[in-house]
Swiss-Prot record:
Catalyzes the methyl esterification of L-isoaspartyl residues in peptides and proteins that result from spontaneous decomposition of normal L-aspartyl and L-asparaginyl residues. It plays a role in the repair and/or degradation of damaged proteins. It comes from Cupriavidus necator (strain ATCC 17699 / DSM 428 / KCTC 22496 / NCIMB 10442 / H16 / Stanier 337) (Ralstonia eutropha). This is Protein-L-isoaspartate O-methyltransferase 1. It catalyses: [protein]-L-isoaspartate + S-adenosyl-L-methionine = [protein]-L-isoaspartate alpha-methyl ester + S-adenosyl-L-homocysteine. One of its GO terms (cellular component) is cytoplasm. The lineage of its organism: Bacteria, Pseudomonadati, Pseudomonadota, Betaproteobacteria, Burkholderiales. It comes from the Bacteria.
Length: 259
């Protein structure tokens, strides 16, 4: 959950371009059916958000190494109702490309960062994904449009309980959630094809490396609060060798727990 990821480059979004219609339709069929009239009314705002994500991704390519976000990820970002995952007072800002407070000192991440982290995981339709830091449930909802199953852990009990209820209400049935210390992962369902951590750790947790499948990818912010943090891509090769690569500087809330 970002508290203000690397300031978005000051770019003017390019002229609207249609998202791949067939791909968007396919993603829509895969997502829950509880789309309301309000969701439909906000579709233009989601489309604007997606265009801004694309513009920021292009402007940040020199740092991130990603010149464009996978169209599958962009299609899902254009379908998931972000306004359902923020407090009422923040709903007017739901489709702005910035983090928003969700209570308990936590935030919902900037849409560009959600898209980038999801893109870096390279999630495939049959994959099982672990998320550390459920927050309001938005990242988990995005992942359900791409993966077979999503497991998500939140250490702050009220946030975790409300996020789980919200995901159930919105019919995201591929998600299993629990309250716990995400540092230790969720061994019962391991190994995972991809892992995403939405809070900054001082180091990459060894339990998460163990639970990552050979050939899998983990995206995690690492660094101390109020100091430099970097978004890391952790890859485990088929022979178990682990490599890491810095993607870009970010600013996340800290990963808390008894570790």
């Amino acid at each position: 959950m970002t508290v203000g990821s690397l300031p978005a480059p000051l770019v003017k979004p390019s002229a609207p371009r249609p998202l791949l219609p067939i791909l968007v339709a396919a993603i829509a069929l895969a997502l829950p059916c509880s789309i309301t009239a309000a969701d439909d009314a906000l579709a233009p705002q989601r489309a604007d958000m997606v265009r801004e994500i694309a513009a920021v991704a292009a402007a940040a390519a020199a740092q991130s190494g990603r010149h464009a976000i996978d169209p599958r990820v962009m299609a899902v970002m254009g379908q998931v109702p972000r306004h359902e995952f923020v407090p009422d007072a923040q709903k007017p800002h739901a489709y702005e490309n910035r983090p928003l407070p969700i209570g308990h000192g936590q935030t919902i991440s900037q849409p560009y960062i959600v898209a980038l982290m999801t893109d870096l995981m390279m999630v495939k339709p049959g994959d099982t994904v672990l998320e550390i830091g459920t927050g309001s449930g938005y990242q988990a909802a995005v992942l359900t449009g791409l993966a077979r199953a999503v497991y998500t852990i939140e250490i702050i009990e009220p946030l975790g309980r409300h996020a789980c209820d919200r995901l159930k209400r919105l019919a995201y049935r591929q998600v299993a959630c629990k309250v716990g210390d995400g540092y230790y992962g969720w061994d019962e369902h391991a190994p995972y094809d991809a892992i995403v951590v939405t809070a900054a750790a001082s180091h990459v947790p060894p339990p998460l490396i163990r639970q990552l499948k050979p050939g899998g990818r983990m995206v995690i912010p690492v660094g101390a609060q109020f100091l430099t943090q970097y978004l890391l891509l952790v890859e485990k090769s088929e022979d178990g060798t682990v490599s890491t690569r810095q993607i870009l500087p970010v600013r996340f809330v800290p990963l808390v727990g008894k570790h």
